[in-house]
Amino acid sequence: MSDEKMDLYLQQGMYGPLETKPDERHLFLGSLRERVLLALTKGQVLRSKPYEKVENALKNSKNITLLINGELQYQSYSPYIQMANRNGVHFKIVSDLQFHTPLGLVIAADIAVNRELIYIQDDIFNRSVLKP
């Protein structure tokens, strides 16, 4: 075994297998862009009235997971957890974030869906650091 292969083998043994598209996974709360059905910024999750588009996506989609940024206060994402429970959708609160992400909520499918428009582009979104 060459030194390069040996080093890679040892690195994976110590730190786990290599991760594909790590920057994308950091942004989308552990998921990949190609799997995202809908994403909200932290500011959008903090909005007092939950988005109907989130409810519709949870109702009308199969094999999805609701990913929630654990940096947010429970009160801000509680309505979305209730929506997920009403519609039988699994959810995860992602709190082991090593990197900052402007996203507060992501609805991700188990397989690639390649949606072009994944953001709700309202005033709150336009004030965020994300650009479509």
Residue ranges and their predicted role:
Residues 56-61, 83, 87:
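Conserved, well-folded catalytic cores of nucleic-acid-processing
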Residues 22-28, 70-78, 97-104:
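Glycine/charge-rich, flexible interdomain linkers and switch-proximal surface loops
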Residues 81-132:
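Short basic, glycine-rich beta-strand/loop surfaces that mediate nucleic-acid
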